[in-house]
């Protein structure tokens, strides 16, 4: 018998040496979920997280921050990615994330705790703050990153918080589709394709706002000149 035949999986398969947030294709996700090993140390960390998480289900709390620390290469990103998959319980290759962990939790109590947690409908937003962050590292940089990825996740244009704020306002009026149709009629292009250049199509945006929301021209033009407060935008996330 050859040594390579003693292993359950093909030892010549491609294995990612570094786990990256951006690697979210189905094949990579399936490999990460199916081949993730819960060591004794990781079992303790999973237990700590989910024991506290499950408490908040029965007794809601605002103490929701979690700090994951460790040396470079210790598996922080991998652990965080697994938590993200489990909480959202996303479907990968026809199988939910929790099902990939069915035989990884050898403690029945821990298994039941995690199962209770993943039953709560949850959306996870996984991102690398260094990649998503702005070049200008001022005191609002972190807030702007969180606002950006959150609004992108909601379908708004988080790359430009003024545009995202405008889209959020239109959406609250229930006029998103009507606005997009009105914009296309005057501009000729789809709003989602043109919104990254919205500042150059101010007249078209204004005309669409007037048509759909019945705003005056002055009020419609104010969106471009309005200030964007990242503190307020982050506070607004609680209304979603």
Q: Each predicted region: which residue ranges?
A:
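Low-complexity, highly charged intrinsically disordered N-terminal segments
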Residues: 1-37, 186-199, 236-239
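N-terminal pre-Walker A segment at the start of P-loop NTPase domains
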Residues: 31-59, 102-105
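Short, well-ordered amphipathic alpha-helices
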Residues: 48-55, 83-89, 150, 240
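Short coil/loop residues immediately preceding or within conserved phosphate-binding loops
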Residues: 63
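P-loop NTPase motor core
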Residues: 66-71, 80-203
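Conserved lysine of the Walker
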Residues: 76
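Conserved helicase/translocase P-loop NTPase motor core
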Residues: 206-240
